[in-house]
Amino acid sequence: GFLYKDNIYFSHYATAWQIFKDYPVAGVGLKNFRAYCSDPAYLDKVYPGYRNINCTTHPHNLYYEILSELGILGAIIFFSFFVYFFYICLKRSYEQSNMFLYGNTLFLMTYFIPFLPRGSFFTNWNAIIFWTIFTISFYLLNKKETHA
């Protein structure tokens, strides 16, 4: 359809998928998508209309970024950590009636909505926002209640 052929992000997704297929276990390393996407081998593997726009600093999608740069092993560790973190945060926010922790957790979870184009998870202003709120949530999760 028109969304696939006219959307520049699909060129990045296709390239990231090809990189993942070539390096499925451990990926190419954090922030190395930019080094591999310009390889001529990937130009031949993507949709012909994307051959001149397939390379950028990151794939613009969290899942493709993690798979291409960290591979299956890294993706399992990465996503397991966040699933566990979100579970603990939601559980504690319910037990303590902490709406601030609950809201922060829901906000952080929106970063994991599939198929949304995003900046790099590790290196841009989106990352600054995510990691700042993550740190606040982590603090709230470990904060000891003080009684006056």
Task: Annotate each PLM feature.
Residues L30-N32, G74-I77, F122:
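Short, flexible micro-motifs
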Residues E69-F112:
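Hydrophobic transmembrane alpha-helices and their immediate junctions
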Residues T15, Y36, L62, I66-I72, ...:
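Generic recognition of well-ordered alpha-helical segments
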Residues F20:
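Conserved short C-terminal alpha-helix that flanks the catalytic cleft of nucleotide-sugar-dependent
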Residues N104-A148:
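Transmembrane alpha-helices of multi-pass inner-membrane enzymes
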Residues Y42, C89-S97, F121, E145:
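Membrane-interfacial segments
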